[in-house]
Amino acid sequence: MRSVVQRVTQASVTVEGEVVGRIGAGLLVLFGVGRGDTEADLNWMVDKIAGLRLFEDGEGKMNRSVQDVGGEILMVSQFTLYGDCRKGKRPSFATAAPPETAGELFQQAVAKMRGYGLHVETGVFQAEMQVALVNDGPVTLLIDSEKNF
């Protein structure tokens, strides 16, 4: 499981000209599911994101989590995080999970994130989406449940 996590002052996702998800200050999470990912990967990823200390404390240190600051989360499913560009010019997505599996795990991740008491907005699974954001910092992290990076 892979995620790109960005600290934002605001973010939104639009499908067919309609805003389907919008947040204020918090985290934009681009969320990818790989072949073979399990509930253990999901639990690790959601726990990691919910607890990441990416927000400044009173001394200006990144010492507070999205939970600590009452931030929001916009989660957008993105299979292209599994694009392999090592050969040729066109990425291969062979290591991305099939849509049925990815959709189920994405919905479970959203539910688990909401279980932390966080306000979570989402995009639309498998839709063409436009994501707008104002990156704060900028703070952008790559997270992989296999701990590849």
UniProtKB/Swiss-Prot annotation:
Transmembrane segments: none annotated. A motif (Gly-cisPro motif, important for rejection of L-amino acids) lies at residues 137-138. Its main location: cytoplasm. It is an enzyme of class 3 (hydrolase). A Gly-cisPro motif from one monomer fits into the active site of the other monomer to allow specific chiral rejection of L-amino acids. Belongs to the DTD family. GO terms for cellular component: cytoplasm. It is found in: Cytoplasm. Keywords: Cytoplasm, Hydrolase, RNA-binding, tRNA-binding. The gene is dtd. The keyword rRNA processing does not apply. Its EC number is 3.1.1.96. GO terms for biological process: D-amino acid catabolic process. Homodimer. An aminoacyl-tRNA editing enzyme that deacylates mischarged D-aminoacyl-tRNAs. Also deacylates mischarged glycyl-tRNA(Ala), protecting cells against glycine mischarging by AlaRS. Acts via tRNA-based rather than protein-based catalysis; rejects L-amino acids rather than detecting D-amino acids in the active site. By recycling D-aminoacyl-tRNA to D-amino acids and free tRNA molecules, this enzyme counteracts the toxicity associated with the formation of D-aminoacyl-tRNA entities in vivo and helps enforce protein L-homochirality. This is D-aminoacyl-tRNA deacylase. It holds the Pfam family Tyr_Deacylase. Gene3D superfamilies: D-tyrosyl-tRNA(Tyr) deacylase. HAMAP family: Deacylase_Dtd (MF_00518). GO terms for molecular function: D-tyrosyl-tRNA(Tyr) deacylase activity; Gly-tRNA(Ala) deacylase activity; Ser(Gly)-tRNA(Ala) hydrolase activity; tRNA binding. InterPro entries: Daa-tRNA_deacyls_DTD (IPR003732), DTD-like_sf (IPR023509). It catalyses: glycyl-tRNA(Ala) + H2O = tRNA(Ala) + glycine + H(+); a D-aminoacyl-tRNA + H2O = a tRNA + a D-alpha-amino acid + H(+).
